[in-house]
C-alpha cells in the first residue's frame, strides 16, 4: 500500500496491521491523500463541505486540536452500504449494538472495541451542524517528519 513518507505514524502501522506491506512515496499532500491502490482516502487533516471522494472509504480523524474538536476518535465516510454494515459490526466486537447484552448471540465476526462514545458522537453532530462550509487544511506533508526509515 502506497503511503507518503511524511504522514502520521499510525497510517503505516494500520496498513501493517491489515497484513499488507507499506511502500513509502514522496507524495506532497495537503489535507488528504489516497492509499493506493485501494479506494481509501486519509482525510485526517481536512474537514470541509463537499470533501467526500465518491466511492471511497474516507477516513476522518477527530482530536481536541483539530478542525472538529471532538475528543479523540474518527469516522469513515462511504457510500458502500455493505461496508457500512461491516464497519458497524467491526467497531463493536463483531456484535449488533442494538441487541441487549443479555440477549446477544455469539459475535458474527472478530471485531474491535472502537466505537465512539454517545456523548462524543452527540458533540460531533452538534459541531458538524455548526461547521463552516470551508476550512483550511490543518495538515499536510509539510507538517510531518519522514517516517520511512522507522523500523516497523
Task: For the regions a language model picked out, list residue spans one by one.
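Active-site region of PLP-dependent enzymes
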Residues: 47-49, 57-152
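PLP-dependent aminotransferase-like
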Residues: 1-50
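Nucleotide-sugar donor-binding and catalytic loop/hinge architecture
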Residues: 53
Amino acid at each position: 500500500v502506497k503511503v507518503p513518507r511524511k504522514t502520521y505514524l499510525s497510517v503505516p502501522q494500520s496498513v501493517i496491521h491489515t497484513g499488507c506491506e507499506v511502500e513509502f512515496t514522496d507524495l506532497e499532500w495537503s489535507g488528504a491523500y489516497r492509499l493506493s491502490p485501494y479506494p481509501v482516502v486519509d482525510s485526517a487533516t481536512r474537514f470541509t463541505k463537499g470533501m467526500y471522494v465518491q466511492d471511497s472509504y474516507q477516513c476522518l480523524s477527530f482530536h481536541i486540536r483539530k478542525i472538529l474538536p471532538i475528543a479523540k476518535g474518527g469516522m469513515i465516510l462511504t457510500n458502500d452500504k455493505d461496508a457500512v454494515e461491516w464497519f458497524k459490526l467491526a467497531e463493536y466486537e463483531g456484535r449488533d449494538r442494538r441487541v441487549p447484552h443479555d440477549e446477544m448471540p455469539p459475535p458474527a465476526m472478530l471485531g474491535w472495541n472502537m466505537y465512539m462514545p454517545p456523548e462524543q458522537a452527540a458533540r460531533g453532530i452538534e459541531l458538524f451542524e455548526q461547521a463552516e462550509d470551508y476550512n483550511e487544511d490543518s495538515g499536510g506533508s509539510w507538517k510531518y517528519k519522514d517516517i520511512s526509515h522507522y523500523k516497523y
